[in-house]
UniProtKB/Swiss-Prot annotation:
Keyword Nucleus attributed: no
EC primary class: oxidoreductase
Subunit structure of this chain's protein: The glycine cleavage system is composed of four proteins: P, T, L and H.
Family: Belongs to the GcvP family.
Keyword check for Oxidoreductase: yes
Organism lineage: Bacteria, Pseudomonadati, Pseudomonadota, Gammaproteobacteria, Lysobacterales
Modification sites for N6-(pyridoxal phosphate)lysine: K715
Gene from which the chain derives: gcvP
Protein name as catalogued: Glycine dehydrogenase (decarboxylating)
Protein keywords: Oxidoreductase, Pyridoxal phosphate
EC numbers: 1.4.4.2
Catalyses which reaction(s): N(6)-[(R)-lipoyl]-L-lysyl-[glycine-cleavage complex H protein] + glycine + H(+) = N(6)-[(R)-S(8)-aminomethyldihydrolipoyl]-L-lysyl-[glycine-cleavage complex H protein] + CO2
One record GO biological process: glycine decarboxylation via glycine cleavage system
Length: 993
């Protein structure tokens, strides 16, 4: 008789002695699932690197001064099943009411085909931002559908590929207007009926930039000397205003008109682009994305074509590939922070791609007629309810789309009656209520809403006699969504196959490792994702009364405590919904702290030249002066230069922004000295948390002298990247900065449902539209930390360090690692310097990146932080087999470069310069290259077993930026190319005959 004793090193070890029940109840199963290499592989890789244990390797890499001497004070890890049971108990504490609060958030039905095949599909949610165009054609097509949808519905000429939320988009619109308007005024006028969260973000953004806000009615804006104006259309109370005269007046004085709008409403009412708007922003949430207690949702911005080089966020454009076929790419990237740094149009990096894809597919699935039916039904329900209330003597707004504004009532009593019936209304004040209907509303909902007011609603009878409540002069007459993509995929089979076709074009982590340096593309475990779609998390309105989200409260409190323990900080805000917004929040906290001490003069931010582009861009948004610090030959912060500049700017020094480990992939020995220098001159130390995956369980920034960090839950703590968002960028601070974390909106909190303030008045405004940012994906990080436990988190960090050093060591005979730390080791990533190879062969880092596609790999980070290099970050989730596959590909590529050097391959017509190679090219009747098809497509034998074929050849970036087109490709563009190719084949066959 025998029993399973234990699992060891991937092999089942048998013992003839009975194991204890405690041994069989193995709690470390998830850790072994998350960490790629098993113990045998770890031992083998350690031998390659030259160490006998993870502990000895960690001691060799991490400076002793900053190493944690005690384990994380977190519980032991638990199994997936136990964690799911535990979070189910938390979720059940939330109470899902029917929410008619509105204020920018509306109920929606997520089509199940989109839920299963986009939101729950790792082919979509594990992809990265589409910097590598050739392996991102599928999601870029989905995003260009999103851009076309937004541009069509708003009546504008161009739209971006998503922003973080509507309020952030409005703040970006204000900045765009300031940059682009002819007026030199510093005054920005804000409609007094914008959503409250939008006004809060405008206030946060305006003050550091020297912009003066004035809030008032559209009539008051007629005579204002402004550089821009923001209108809400329909407004937060549901009114649909005619703003044509105002738009003309603003334009006459050199200002720009920005409008916050609603995509569903714009199917019925005149789009802002047709009555004078220059910029339109909004939220696509009601196109199939749940409330999620505030997010994530895809905001958007559309504008006139003349502002395309100033619009923030990513733009998908159309170019051509090397074969002349249409191909998508990121357009006009020189606007963005990773290139323009403090001169960028915005600090935005991560946006909301996954949610934009969902919204675009909602429009594709329903098409223009389906959207019209949803919009008219929503409006009809609102009109019927309004008629019933008016019939009972209540005062309701005259014109509206979906939102009723009821005045002159006992709002408290009615609000309480609605809550007792399981419904949430918007209480504006003691005498005013708002009711916003949506596509989920039923006839019984309308009857129940009437009963709350003591009114009997006969839906059928009222439908027969009630007129619509849209203003006749503002009805939409223009067509929208006319492209075939919105008029083809309306059956589930058609959409299912369209989604599969798009996903098959791309490389995501369900196919291959994505070794992007500074991006931490680690496992997004399925168990972590499961709670996200539970209705107890997905269906809570962000402005619901606090008694309805006690489960969220517990989860948020526990996650904040976990993150504080991992970082050594004292307080956390989960409001920032991207890393860039976390940076922004941290710098605002520093700014407010200095001002609270009467040191307004402190506005200089020191930033190393190696920093991520969001650092200087965020500092600029806070009104800070950016001063660059040099790096030494080893890639470290030049301490002498730092000391000199800290002394020079001693009276005005606000902060130092430093990434740790550095963006050069090393643990700098002088980090504590760096912090001391900055503190000695009155500054605060901001540690960018982008590389926190090298620190968890090993070192805590809050303990070595750092005052504030942002974290990337979409990197270190396993929220998926989603192809470019969502993300969560918590701001973590020491105690003295805690009072300066972002404020929150008042929420209905007492028994009567009256708005109440928090226990402490915040001194810094909101940085995201919702109090807890992208709250519905916080369960992902909670699950990860809970399942890993203290020991698992430390081991994950150690294996991340090991994997990076293993790659560097194995590639050392072939590629130089640009920077190393102590003992010739790197941190969790390494920079491969291919510049010497380019000098002798002409092969660039970009050529290597494109060639890796032929091997089935997403490229490492290209030309950051050093131009002409490749930065590799494998993370702890990749097995030795996958690491070896990558190493073998890189060695093969080095061999091809050597063949060019020796003259065995042509300097131009070689597989690197011509990469990537499509199936169409390889199988064409003619092969015009000086190398074989086999070398092009199957440079390694393993590729015969599993081969990824890129859908396009190398994309022409120059053509794309010279011929900017950011909407769906006309079908004729494909047809013309196909016709010409067919004609060529006919002629070729004829010549053979």
């Amino acid at each position: 008789m025998f029993s399973v004793s234990h699992f060891c090193s991937g092999s089942l070890m048998m013992s003839h002695t009975l194991s204890s029940l405690r041994d069989l109840e193995y709690q470390g199963a998830f850790v072994e699932r998350h960490i790629g290499p098993n113990d045998v592989e770890i031992a083998q890789m350690l031998r390659v690197v030259g160490y006998d244990s993870l502990e000895s390797l960690t001691d060799a890499i991490v400076p002793e001064k900053i190493r944690s001497t005690v384990a994380l004070d977190l519980p032991k890890g638990i199994t997936e099943e136990e964690a799911l049971a535990k979070i189910r108990v938390i979720a059940n504490k939330n109470r899902v009411f029917r929410s008619f609060i509105g204020q920018g958030y509306y109920g929606t039905h997520t089509p199940k085909v989109i839920l299963r095949n986009v939101l729950e599909n790792p082919a979509w949610y594990t992809a990265y931002t589409p910097y590598q165009a050739e392996i991102s054609q599928g999601r870029m097509e989905a995003l260009i559908n999103f851009q076309t949808m937004c541009a069509d519905l708003t009546g504008m000429e161009i739209a971006n590929a998503s922003l973080l939320d509507e309020a952030t988009a409005a703040a970006e619109a204000m900045s765009l207007a300031k940059r682009s308007a002819k007026s030199r005024s510093d005054l920005f006028f804000v409609h007094d009926a914008v959503h409250p969260q939008t006004l809060e973000l405008l206030r946060t953004r305006a003050e550091p930039l020297g912009i003066v806000l004035r809030v008032g009615t559209p009539e008051e804006a007629l005579q204002a000397d402004v550089f821009g104006i923001l209108l809400q259309y329909p407004d937060t109370f549901g009114r649909i205003g005619d703003h044509r005269v105002l738009a003309d007046a603003v334009h006459a004085r050199g200002g720009l008109v920005a409008v916050a709008s609603d995509l569903l409403a714009l199917t019925l009412i005149t789009p802002p682009g047709e009555w004078g708007a220059d910029i339109v922003v909004g939220n696509s949430q009601r196109f199939g994305v749940p409330f999620g207690f505030g997010g994530p949702h895809a905001g958007f911005m559309a504008c006139r074509d003349i502002y395309k080089r100033s619009i923030p966020g990513r733009l998908i454009g159309v170019s051509v590939d090397a074969a002349g076929h249409p191909a998508y790419r990121l357009a006009l990237q020189t606007r963005e922070q990773h290139i323009r740094r403090e001169k960028a149009t915005s600090n935005i990096c991560t946006a909301q791609v996954l949610l934009a894809v969902m919204a675009s597919m909602y429009a594709v699935y329903h098409g223009p007629q389906g959207l019209l039916r949803i919009a008219w039904r929503t409006h009809r329900m609102a009109a019927i309810l309004a008629a019933a209330l008016r019939g009972a003597g209540l005062t309701v707004g005259e014109y509206f789309f979906d939102t009723l504004h009821i005045v002159g009532i006992d709002a408290v009593a009615i609000h309480c009656a609605a809550a007792a019936a399981g419904m949430n209304l918007r209480m504006i004040d003691n005498a005013q209520l708002g009711i916003s209907l949506d596509e989920t509303v039923t006839r019984s909902d309308v009857v129940a809403l009437g009963q709350v007011f003591g009114v009997q609603v006969d839906v059928e009878a009222l439908d027969a006699i009630t007129a619509d409540a849209l203003p006749a002069g503002l009805l939409r007459s223009s067509a929208f969504l006319t492209h075939p993509v919105f008029n083809t995929h309306h059956s589930e089979h058609e959409l299912l196959r369209y989604l599969r076709m798009l996903a098959d074009k791309d490389l995501a982590m369900d196919r291959t490792m994505i070794p992007l340096g500074s991006c931490t593309m680690k496992l997004n475990a399925t168990a972590e994702m499961i709670p996200v779609t539970w209705q107890e998390f997905a269906c809570i309105h962000p402005l619901a009364p606090a008694v309805q989200w006690s489960g969220y409260r517990q989860l948020i409190d526990e996650l904040e405590a976990m993150l504080a323990e991992c970082t050594g900080y004292d307080a956390i805000s989960l409001q920032p919904n991207s890393g860039a917004q976390g940076e922004y929040a941290g710098l605002l906290a520093i700014r407010a702290y200095h001002r609270s001490r009467g040191e307004e003069r402190r506005n200089v931010c020191l930033i190393p030249e190696s920093a991520h582009g969001t650092n200087p861009a965020s500092a600029q948004l806070c009104g800070m002066q950016v001063v660059i610090i040099k790096c030494d030959r080893s890639g470290n912060v030049d301490v002498d230069d730092l000391r000199m500049k800290a002394e020079k700017y001693s009276d005005s020094l606000a902060a130092l922004m430093v990434t740790y480990p550095s963006t050069h992939g090393v643990f700098e020995e002088a980090i504590t000295e760096i912090c001391e220098i900055v503190h000695a001159h009155g500054g605060q130390v901001y540690t960018d948390g982008a590389n926190m995956n090298a620190l968890v369980g090993v070192a805590k920034p809050g303990r070595w002298g750092s005052d504030v960090s942002h974290l990337n839950l979409h990197k270190t703590f396993c929220i998926p990247h989603g192809g470019g968002g969502p993300g969560v960028g918590p701001c973590a601070v020491k105690a003295h900065l805690a009072p300066f974390l972002p404020k929150t909106l008042p929420l209905p909190g007492d028994a009567a449902g009256l708005p109440v303030q928090g226990t402490q008045e915040a001194k810094v405004g909101m940085v995201s539209a919702a109090n807890f940012g992208s709250a519905s994906i916080l369960p992902v990080s909670w699950m990860y930390i809970t399942m890993m436990g203290a020991a698992g988190l430390r081991k994950a960090t150690q294996v991340a360090l090991l994997n990076a050093n293993y790659i560097a060591k194995r590639l050392a005979p072939h590629y130089k690692t640009l920077y190393t730390g102590r003992h010739g080791l790197v941190a969790h990533e390494c920079i491969l310097d291919v510049r010497p190879l380019e000098k002798v062969s002409g092969v660039s880092a970009e050529d290597i990146a494109k060639r890796l596609i032929d091997f089935g790999f997403h490229a490492p980070t290209l030309s950051f932080p050093v131009a002409g290099t490749l930065m590799v970050e494998p993370t702890e989730s990749e097995s030795q087999q996958e690491l070896d596959r990558f190493v073998d590909a890189m060695i093969q590529i080095r061999g091809e470069i050597a063949a060019i050097e020796k003259g065995h391959l042509d300097p131009e017509d070689n597989p690197l310069k011509q990469a990537p190679h499509t199936a169409v090219q390889v199988m064409a009747s003619q092969w015009g290259h000086a190398y074989s098809r086999e070398l092009a497509a199957f440079p390694l034998g393993v590729l015969h077993h599993a081969k990824y074929w890129p859908p396009v050849a190398r994309v022409d970036n120059v053509y794309g930026d010279k011929h900017v087109m950011c909407a769906c490709i006309p079908v004729e563009a494909y047809k013309e190319k196909e016709d010409s190719e067919i004609q060529h084949l006919i002629e070729e066959d004829a010549s053979r005959c």
